A protein has these predicted regions:
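Short, basic amphipathic alpha-helical segments that act as recognition/interaction helices
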Residues: 40-62
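Short, charged recognition helix plus adjacent turn
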Residues: 133-157
Length: 310
């Protein structure tokens, strides 16, 4: 099945009408020579040329859409270091074989929306990105922590029991220091801090590293800072269970993560600096930047930490 037929069928149901075409002498001479060579009338040659032009204009749109879906799916597996043999294993439930993966047309013929959504779920990707309806790979807003540090910490703890190799990367931009961000006005020193989770996932016997990009918020804003400090307190208290590291990247990388335009797997080899979350906890008992009694909030965290230790 050709690509354009896979997307849509263009049917000519219009009534034919006579049309007068004015040709330059040299053009008419060329077309007449072609009509004699092909053994058809001049009008038929003109129709053939026009049909060919329309076909060439229409075909790339359909071909590019299909190729885009195929390429985006392939890129997801490649970025997670999954080869074609393992890819076929993961997709075997949909009847996908190695021969389908190596042939875009065969692959697209079997592709279904259910398969697209499952692939998206495997890699924490927005399925609409796969089909070309959005440029946003994922939404960091799907994993929020602002005003609910406890809920986010509980989520991390639950994930650590399901995935023993859970790693939490606390990401910030390296354009400004924490101290400077607290002192200067936000418009001059905006500093975003967020989280990337990574852990081993397994599908049909194939293991790969899965990434989740979580919410980014401003260290400049005292309330965001207050909730972040409670998360830092929790992570530092369970550091023997959950591997956590503070990392700094340039603003472009952080902006790309915040906007859902950058695959988190691609930042591993990029230049970064490390920092220690323990140095940013402060006097947690008097952390009045949260919209709750800090002592009561701290007690909830301590009970959670004790449960983990037992």
């Amino acid at each position: 099945m050709v690509a354009e037929d896979r997307i849509s069928q263009l049917e000519d149901t219009s009534v034919k009408e006579l049309t007068t075409v004015r040709l330059r002498p040299e053009t008419k001479a060329y077309l007449q020579s072609q009509s004699e060579t092909l053994g058809v009338s001049l009008s038929q040659v003109i129709n053939m040329i026009l049909d060919g032009v329309v076909s060439m204009e229409m075909k790339p749109a359909s071909d590019n859409k299909i190729k885009g879906i195929y390429d985006r799916i392939m890129s997801l597996f490649e970025l997670h270091n999954i080869n074609t043999v393992d890819m076929a294993k993961m997709l075997s439930g949909y009847g996908i074989k190695l021969s389908h993966i190596r042939n875009p047309d065969k692959f697209i013929d079997i592709l279904s929306m259910d398969m697209i959504k499952e692939i998206a779920n495997w890699f924490s990707i927005n399925y609409k990105w796969i089909i070309g309806e959005t440029n946003e790979l994922y939404s960091p807003r799907d994993n929020t922590w602002y005003k609910d540090s406890y809920g986010f910490s509980l989520l991390l703890l639950e994930k650590s029991f399901r995935h023993s190799d859970l790693k939490v990367s606390v990401v910030k931009a390296n354009n400004v220091s924490f101290e400077k961000a607290e002192k200067l006005e936000e418009q001059y020193s905006r500093l975003y801090v967020g989280f990337i989770l990574s852990y081993t996932s397994k599908v049909n016997g194939v293991s790969f590293t899965k990434y989740e990009v979580c919410e980014f918020q401003r260290w400049n804003y005292n309330k965001c800072r207050g909730y972040l400090r409670f998360i830092f307190y929790f992570l530092d208290s369970v550091r023997t269970r959950i591997n956590c590291q503070g990392v700094s990247f340039n603003e472009e990388i952080v902006d790309g993560l915040m906007a859902g335009r950058l695959f988190p797997s691609t930042i591993k080899g990029m230049l970064s600096e490390t920092w220690f979350i323990a140095e940013r906890i402060g006097h947690i008992e008097s952390n009045y930047d949260v919209e709750i009694n800090p002592v009561e909030y701290l007690n909830r965290f301590n009970r959670l930490i004790r449960l983990f230790r037992f």
